[in-house]
Structure formats: structure tokens, C-alpha cells
């Protein structure tokens, strides 16, 4: 008789106070953070990780910004405090694209995230989890919080800021909000403003989480029950379909059944098992509250808001800029990267990452992305 020894899913996969710090360090904002929608957020702190060393004149710092479900653990093994290995292995290290013999690399966990930075799962000043009380934030708010990293290290400007997807949104906001602080800019698979289709894809994901009976309006952290892992699992399945390419799905899975299962008898296709796997995997390292907060921030991303529109906002960017998209990305199609390259003064022509992996190509095509990073840093 077989017994399932798989541990149950946690109500949240967030890093919580008392967990091992791993390779994280923290920077605390000295004042409450003013928010774009009004009001302010007190007690903000950001978790971050670093690789390499600052040079004498502090001119070699590179900022790496993660996507929606990423965190500060860009490279490195899974272990205490880090529920998953690095999400961009092969990019940072001696002799690699971000050569730690030359550059000091900094990667924060985004404001609103769940791996050490202030977010819905973290402790508010009153000692309780923020939960539903966590305010609506924007991509611009996250960047204003990250400015504290410059002060923390005594850096005047970043040698480069780079990011993909939500990380690219943040990188663009860095260059538009603080143009004198960003010398080089790499934007991967990201837009100047979120499109109607991107917002539409996000809508059922948010509904899935909020419809989970264990969501409790966002206040589930210290309540009995499994937490909204079912709703977040549905959201992850929907999102993952948009992250990958149709050709990859056909070539990798086709119409094959999952091993030992028969779809004609109620079993799963292999591609369904793949989506189930990613839903469970995310639940062990991420948080539904952060999923909602950060998805809302991505929905409202618009670099032109309050700046006279996108075209005028892009003209604010003074960094040496490279823009790249993925050939098979239907979530953030190449036309959006073309808009960035056309609008940013001095930007190179759009670079195309050839991949069947869809939007996730900026994460999976390490060799191609490494070439782009090296080229940008050589300029």
C-alpha cells in the first residue's frame, strides 16, 4: 500500500520573520514611503542580495530587477531561507555576463513581494500581517523604494539597470524617474505601458485568487485553513500558458497523456500535469497577497502617466539603452519593444531573442541574453 509523503502546501510560501535569512540583507527606509495613489507606507524595508565588490569610486554597481514571481535570489542554490534556486543561473559570476570580478551586482526583492521585502505577508508596525491593509502600489512606487539602495552603498549612479517583464517595467521607471542615476539600461520583454490584452489576461488570475474561500479578503496569514493556494494555483496555470510558446507546447507535449494516465478515462494530458506541477511549485515559494498586489501594479504600469504621455516620458531617458524581445512572445510582443526602441533617444535597434519558449525566453536563453549584457556593458 502506497502512502503520499508529499508535505501539504503552506498557506503562504512567503519568507516570514524567524525564517533563516539565507543570503539576504536588508535596507530600511528612514521615512514613510509616499505613494503615487496618495497616502504613505511606513516601516518599509527591502531585502536584497549582492555579488562582487564595489570599486574605489563606486562606479561599478549594476541593478538587476526580477519579474513577477522572482526575488532577490538571482543565482545560488536552494537552501535555508531560499525555497528555490536562482532564477537566472549562468548570468552572474566570475567571467560571466555580469562578471563579479568587475561589477558589484545588487538585486532587491520588490516592494510588495514576499521574500523579505515589505508586502502583504510581512509584519505591519502594529505587529500583525499587513494583509488586506497593504495599500495599492505602482511600479513607480517600487522604484522610489529601491532608491534607498543608492544611499545604502553611497552610489551616485548605476553602471547599468536591467530587468525583464515586470523587472523591465521597473528598469524603465528607474531611467525615466531618475535619468541621472542610470548610465546603461537593458529592457527585456517589457512594455512602456501595459496593454488591454495584458490586463485582460491578468483579470481571471485575480478573480481566481479572490474567489478562493480561504482568501478571507487577503487576511488569511494567521487563520486556520490552507490559505488561497487553490486560487493562486489556477492563476499560475493561466499565467504559465501566456509565458510559454505554442510551438514549445506542441513539440514538448503534443497530445500525449501523462505517464500512467488516460485522458479518455478522466486522466490528464501531459501538458495538464506540467501546469499542475508549476502551480504546486509556486505555492511553496510565493504568496497570493503579493500575487494580487504586484499584478495590480503591472496592470497600472504606464511610464507616461503624469509625464505628458509615453512618447514624452521616453524622451526623459538619457541612459545608453538596449531593448530586446523574444521572437515567440505573444504576451509582451515585439511591437511593444519596438515602441521603446523608437522612443528612447539613442537606443539601439530592437534585439530579438530567438526562442520557442515564449515570454520566458528572456529567462531560458541564457547564452543570447549574456551576449546582450556583455555588449551593453562594453559601450
Swiss-Prot record:
One of its GO terms (molecular function) is homoserine O-acetyltransferase activity. GO terms for cellular component: cytoplasm. It catalyses: L-homoserine + acetyl-CoA = O-acetyl-L-homoserine + CoA. The keyword Transcription does not apply. Its EC number is 2.3.1.31. Substrate binds at residues 236, 360. PANTHER family: HOMOSERINE O-ACETYLTRANSFERASE. HAMAP family: MetX_acyltransf (MF_00296). This is Homoserine O-acetyltransferase. It comes from Thermobifida fusca (strain YX).
Amino acid at each position: 500500500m502506497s502512502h503520499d509523503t508529499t508535505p501539504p502546501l503552506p498557506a503562504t510560501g512567503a519568507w516570514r520573520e524567524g525564517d533563516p535569512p539565507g543570503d539576504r540583507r536588508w535596507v530600511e527606509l528612514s521615512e514613510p514611503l509616499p505613494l503615487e495613489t496618495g497616502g504613505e507606507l511606513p516601516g518599509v524595508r527591502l531585502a536584497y542580495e549582492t555579488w562582487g565588490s564595489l570599486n574605489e569610486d563606486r562606479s561599478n554597481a549594476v541593478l538587476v530587477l526580477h519579474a513577477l514571481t522572482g526575488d532577490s535570489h538571482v543565482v545560488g542554490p536552494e537552501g535555508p531561507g531560499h525555497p528555490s534556486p536562482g532564477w537566472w543561473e549562468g548570468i552572474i559570476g566570475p567571467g560571466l555576463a555580469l562578471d563579479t570580478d568587475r561589477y558589484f551586482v545588487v538585486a532587491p526583492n520588490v516592494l510588495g513581494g514576499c521574500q523579505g521585502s515589505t508586502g502583504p505577508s510581512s509584519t505591519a508596525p502594529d505587529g500583525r500581517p499587513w494583509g488586506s491593509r497593504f495599500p495599492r502600489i505602482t511600479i513607480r512606487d517600487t522604484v522610489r523604494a529601491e532608491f534607498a539602495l543608492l544611499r545604502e552603498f553611497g552610489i551616485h549612479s548605476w553602471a547599468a539597470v536591467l530587468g525583464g517583464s515586470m523587472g523591465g517595467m521597473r528598469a524603465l521607471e528607474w531611467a525615466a524617474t531618475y535619468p541621472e542615476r542610470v548610465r546603461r539600461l537593458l529592457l527585456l520583454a517589457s512594455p512602456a505601458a501595459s496593454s488591454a490584452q495584458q490586463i485582460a489576461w491578468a483579470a481571471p488570475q485575480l478573480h481566481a485568487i479572490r474567489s478562493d474561500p480561504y482568501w478571507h479578503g487577503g487576511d488569511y496569514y494567521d487563520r486556520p485553513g490552507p490559505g488561497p493556494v487553490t486560487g493562486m494555483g489556477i492563476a499560475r496555470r493561466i499565467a504559465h500558458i501566456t509565458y510559454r510558446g505554442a510551438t514549445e507546447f506542441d513539440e514538448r507535449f503534443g497530445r500525449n497523456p501523462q505517464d500512467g494516465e488516460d485522458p479518455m478515462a478522466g486522466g490528464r494530458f501531459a501538458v495538464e500535469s506540467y501546469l499542475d506541477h508549476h502551480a504546486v511549485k509556486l505555492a511553496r515559494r510565493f504568496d497570493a497577497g503579493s500575487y494580487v498586489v504586484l499584478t495590480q501594479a503591472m496592470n497600472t504600469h504606464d511610464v507616461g502617466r503624469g509625464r505628458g504621455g509615453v512618447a514624452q516620458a521616453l524622451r526623459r531617458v538619457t541612459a545608453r539603452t538596449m531593448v530586446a524581445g523574444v521572437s515567440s512572445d505573444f504576451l509582451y510582443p515585439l511591437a511593444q519593444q519596438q515602441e521603446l526602441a523608437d522612443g528612447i533617444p539613442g537606443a539601439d535597434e530592437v534585439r530579438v531573442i530567438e526562442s520557442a519558449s515564449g515570454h520566458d525566453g528572456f529567462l531560458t536563453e541564457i547564452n543570447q541574453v549574456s551576449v546582450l549584457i556583455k555588449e551593453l556593458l562594453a559601450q
